[in-house]
UniProtKB/Swiss-Prot annotation:
The keyword Metal-binding does not apply. PROSITE patterns: COA_CT_CTER. Disulfide bonds: none annotated. One of its GO terms (cellular component) is acetyl-CoA carboxylase complex. It is an enzyme of class 2 (transferase). It is found in: Cytoplasm. It holds the Pfam family ACCA. GO terms for biological process: fatty acid biosynthetic process; malonyl-CoA biosynthetic process. This is Acetyl-coenzyme A carboxylase carboxyl transferase subunit alpha. Its EC number is 2.1.3.15. It comes from the Bacteria. It catalyses: N(6)-carboxybiotinyl-L-lysyl-[protein] + acetyl-CoA = N(6)-biotinyl-L-lysyl-[protein] + malonyl-CoA. One of its GO terms (molecular function) is acetyl-CoA carboxylase activity. It comes from Xanthomonas campestris pv. campestris (strain ATCC 33913 / DSM 3586 / NCPPB 528 / LMG 568 / P 25).
Length: 319
């Protein structure tokens, strides 16, 4: 898969193009460009490290939305020995923007739920661009209760611009579906680990985002609104999205500092899409480590810790 370069990655694209040109020029035995290629590769590594060392919040937002970024099903395929997807909310329909089911990770049974976007036009429409409707959140709730019934740990993967705001979704109770999930997840009697793998957009993300641990990939985002939406409201100008991204504090590093995220998982240089296999293995190792810790905690203590965790959000000291 050829990388889809973002605007701030243009120096990287230029260097990689030069390397490709040299390779094409060295097709004959009389031409040896190994030294030049090595020099360019060294320069590429240095330049890439420089660019990704100090990304702005807006640049991180672009990476979180990268069209080649791994989605929930990609991670499931990498991490799970086996996986059986379950469909439908048993009331209205099957929302393809939410996927979930039963799986095994290194033989350990788990329930997995996550947002799912599409790759091409057809699948993007089928997945509604990763924006769930009420039936998607009710499907997720069905799987949550299944996890509780069979005492299986729950893993959720968050990657959505937000819940779908269409008229039909509102008529079918979008806000109620999200609110119910928040309430039910707070009381699930099994370990729950939530991971932001891409975009974490407002209530659409929170509806599968309440748990005992909140993990976040290095170039993910988590916010009450998109930078463009925030800019349109505050400055009446979507072009000020860069400023809005900084003000929203939506990056993993910032949220970890605020105590809203427990662990930031480092991505491969250039982002998860540059090496999805490596990212999947790294995420798997972290999840298994967190599960080992949580499964040692008695249920009553787990519930109390989760309650105290949720009550701590937004707390401040002052006169």
């Amino acid at each position: 898969m050829n990388p889809n370069y973002l605007d701030f990655e243009q120096p990287i694209a230029d260097l990689e193009a030069k390397i490709q040109e040299l390779r094409k020029a060295s097709t004959g035995p009389a031409v040896n460009v190994d030294a030049e290629v090595r020099a360019l590769r060294d320069k590429l590594r240095v330049r890439t490290a420089q660019i990704f060392r100090d990304l702005s919040a807006w640049q991180v937002s672009q990476l979180a939305r990268h069209p080649q970024r791994p989605y929930t099903l990609d991670y499931i395929n990498t991490m799970c020995d086996e996986f059986q997807e379950l469909a439908g909310d048993r009331a209205y329909a099957d929302d393809k923007a939410i996927v979930g089911g039963l799986g095994r990770i290194d033989g350990r049974p788990v329930v997995i739920i996550g947002h799912q976007k599409g790759r091409d036009t057809k699948s993007k429409v089928a997945r509604n661009f990763g924006m769930p409707r009420p039936e998607g959140y009710r499907k997720a709730l069905r799987l949550m209760k299944l996890a509780e019934r069979f005492r299986l740990p729950l893993l959720t993967f968050i990657d959505t611009p937000g819940a779908y705001p269409g008229i039909g979704a509102e008529e079918r109770g979008q806000s109620e579906a999200i609110a119910r999930n928040l309430m039910e997840m707070a009381e699930l009697k099994v370990p729950v680990i939530c991971t932001v793998i891409g975009e974490g957009g407002s209530g659409g993300a929170l509806a599968i985002g309440v748990g005992d641990r909140t993990l976040m990939l290095e170039y993910g985002t988590y916010s009450v609104i998109s930078p463009e939406g925030c800019a349109s409201i505050l400055w009446k100008d979507a072009a000020k999205a860069k400023d809005a991204a900084e003000q929203l504090g939506l990056t993993a590093k910032r949220l970890k500092g605020l105590g809203l995220v427990d662990k930031v998982i480092r991505e491969p240089t250039g982002g998860a899409h540059r090496n999805p296999e490596q990212m999947g293995k790294r995420l798997k190792a972290v999840l298994l480590n967190e599960l080992d810790a949580l499964e040692k905690v008695p249920v009553d203590a787990l519930m109390q810790q989760r309650y105290e965790r949720l009550r701590s959000y937004g707390a401040y000291e002052g006169h």
